[in-house]
Amino acid sequence: MNIKNNVLKVLSGEESDITPVLSVTQIAIVEAMEKTDVYWPEAHINADMMAILGSSLHELAGLECARIPFCLTVEAEAMGCTVDLGSIERTPQVTETPFRTASDIEVPTDFLNKGRIPVVLEAIKRLKDEYGDTIPIIVGMTGPFTLTGHLLGVENMLRDMKMRPGDIENAVDNSLDVCMDYAEAISQAEPDIICVAEPTAAPELIDPLQFKTIVKPRLEDLANVIRTKKILHICGSSQPIIHDMASIGYDAISVEENVDIAKAKHDLEKGGKVLRVGGKVMNMGGETSSKIVGNISSTQTLFRGSIEDVKEEVKKALNAGVDILAPSCGLAPRSPIANIKAMVEARNEFYDKIQ
């Protein structure tokens, strides 16, 4: 079985050989850093190190992908925000922004040459040279709503959504321009999958109507410029917005452990069927082709659980019909490799029993 082709089959709606097991979210862990002698924060700013660490869990645990980068601050940094690159077990964080109000946000003319964007694009090339024919290369990027939160501060953005909604929508549109430019640059580097992460659009932070009217249209516009397979990841209890997530035009949606996979699949069947015409995504109503990725708990089971806990949760997800098996969100840096291996082993054992 060719691992890459198997994953792409699933995302294309074709019959696959076996349910893939990979990660569409943050993939680096300390134990892998120690085994590869490649560490954070250096791997955030060095293309060779980023590629090595991004493929480390394929080499060490059998995970069926390489995935970069390791945070959601690349775009904000290129926009002029100050970013603390963190430590060996702490991901980068935005610490300061030059933007005081929504109207201040402007896209620098040389945005794609700033910050770590060139590092990410070069790391894609390194991974393609090493793994291009064997495993899918996944590149994560920040969605426009979450990026706006980085640029203005999440609390400020959420407050202004009530007080000055028009200003915030304009700011999200400016962030969308940034995301579209970056998505086009990533697409030109030709990874296999782009995963758009919109954690700030979780129902715990905004209500489903705000998602439908503010976030969803921008995610549709972003989907239209992505020229690879595309996955949408939203954190939290995303069950209330599954129907809308499924009708945006992404090949798959990634959900966390508090989402009922069986119910989500049922809701997807009632989602929006999409038709691509001239590169545009059109919502046609009816059934959707979006697949479900998830949802082994990254904060509990993979981080703190036993091997038996991991295998039990994998079995539950596979029985529920998950299309691609994956951690529910980014891996905690102190997650043990043994638990990642157990996720792969449990998938294999599941298929051994049904054959």
Language model regions located:
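Active-site loop segments of alpha/beta catalytic cores
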Residues: 1-31, 64, 89-91, 111-355
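Surface-exposed, active-site-proximal loop segments in enzymatic domains
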Residues: 34-41, 79-86, 102-108, 152-165
